[in-house]
Structure formats: structure tokens, C-alpha cells
């Protein structure tokens, strides 16, 4: 739980995305991290409460465009404070997650998405649901939510077995913006209504990171969005 777990990514649409890397858990020296679910919840909390947009870059951009001397510096400071506030909230979110699941969270167990709506509700983020929309219905469901400024949590099923949770916080006519907690990267993924959305994290990503807590994908592990989605309903 540190500032080094948060990364800011800028996409080709000039949008800024806050990506939180999942916690690293080792068992007998081996990486046993299965904390993508809680990391996705942390990202949704950050994005929904507008930590970055309301108190960070938007404010900084407004100050800069007004011609106030030092506007860029002020905007940067606000962005830093926004992330710091998100980090301060993490212990409470971990506690809520533990209370909802009934077991102490340590990041080594697989997440159950049916628990996510209650965790998000207890974070005062409204009413959420975990729904099956099918592989072909995922794009429309995700876009309907992100068009309102509300991110969703998507479930990726790996072709070789296993699964992964990611956050989608923006969608365009033929793409979705995927915030991946494993390597803290943002990926612009091709998508179309009625079609299964493939996800290949091994594809080349343009980004720049100075250190930080993040994982790297190893052998090729392509997959696709299964059709499960956690979204806000009220």
C-alpha cells in the first residue's frame, strides 16, 4: 500500500487513467499474487470518487488555462495529493473486503466477483451488481456505463486456464480502455458490439514507468472477456 502502486497513464484520446497495481504476495519464494480483484475495487473507488479528475488534473488544467503563474505546478501538487488520499483509504477498503468475504484478505486467494457489489456499496458508491451479459454483450454493457463516467470491472478468462479482473473506465466506438492491475498498464483494446472481446496482454504497450510495484506478464497468455461484469445499477 504505497504511492509506488499507483500509475498514471495517458492514452491516444488524451484521457488520463489511474491504474493501481495489485499487491505482490509470495509463498515459499514464488509469486502467488491473486489480488487483482481488490486492486480493481481500489481503482473503481478512486475513479468514482473523482480523486484524480476532481482534485487533480482537471483542476490543474483549469488553473493552467486561466494563465495563473505556477498553474502547472499547482495542478501537479493536487494530483499528488489526490493519489495520497486514495492510498490513505486503502486500509479501510481492505477491512471492508475482509468483512464482506468473511476471511482475512492477504492477496493470495482468488476473488469472488459476487462479493464486489457489497464492498462497493459499503464504500458509499451506490448500488452495484455482478451480472452475466455474455461475451457478445460485454462491450455494450461496459460502454453504457463508462459513457456515464462510471467504470466497470470485467472478468477475463485466460485461454490456458485461470482468470483475471480488470477495470474498464472508458469506451469509444470501437475500443475499450483496460486498466490492468497485474502490470499496471493501460491497454486500448479493439471491441465491437455483439462480438467477443479478445485480450492479449503480451501485445506491445507504449508506456513509461520509473520503478514502482508492478508485475510483468511472462509466457503468452491471451484470453477474452467472459461476459461477467460488475457495474453500478443505482
Regions found by a protein language model. Give the residues of each.
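A short glycine/serine-rich beta->alpha loop
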Residues: 11-32
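Mature, Sec-exported extracytoplasmic domains of Gram-positive
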Residues: 28-29, 39, 43, 108
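Intrinsically disordered, low-complexity domain-flanking/linker segments in eukaryotic proteins
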Residues: 58, 63-69
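N-terminal carbohydrate-binding/catalytic regions of secreted carbohydrate-active enzymes
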Residues: 35, 39-40, 44-46, 54
